């Protein structure tokens, strides 16, 4: 049997906890002493709205934005996300992306 992240089979699609992932993004940003405004400017956004939505667990960043955040925060993109089976959550959130 092939296994990927954790004990999930490699061919199984991972599900991420949107609220816990947002909290992780906020915690890492704060640990790095980076302001929301600095993230906005780095990303080339006109407002902070997207950053606040990600951190509030309203939606996930698009793949290119997730990679840019990871570069800014000096972590891997996977370090910004928390799998659902690692927290007690029953909601599936695929489709919420901004």
Language model regions located:
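Short alpha-helical DNA-recognition segment
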Residues: 32-53
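Conserved N-terminal glycine/acidic-rich loop preference
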Residues: 16-19, 61-68
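Residue-level detection of the helix-turn-helix DNA-binding "recognition helix"
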Residues: 30, 44, 56-58, 85
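Residue-level signal for the short linker/turn that defines the boundary of a DNA-recognition helix
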Residues: 23, 33-34, 46, 61-64
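DNA major-groove recognition helix of helix-turn-helix/homeodomain DNA-binding modules
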Residues: 64-79
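DNA major-groove recognition helix of helix-turn-helix
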Residues: 54-55, 65
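Short, charged recognition helix plus adjacent turn
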Residues: 2-15, 71, 81-98
């Amino acid at each position: 049997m092939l296994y990927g992240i954790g004990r999930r089979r490699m061919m199984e699609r991972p599900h991420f906890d949107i609220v816990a992932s947002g909290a992780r993004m906020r915690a890492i940003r704060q640990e790095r002493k980076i302001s929301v405004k600095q993230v906005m400017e780095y990303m080339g956004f006109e407002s902070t709205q997207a950053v606040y939505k990600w951190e509030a667990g309203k939606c996930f960043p698009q793949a290119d934005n997730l990679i840019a955040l990871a570069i800014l925060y000096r972590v891997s993109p996977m370090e910004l996300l928390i799998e659902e089976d690692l927290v007690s959550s029953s909601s599936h959130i695929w489709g919420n992306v901004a």
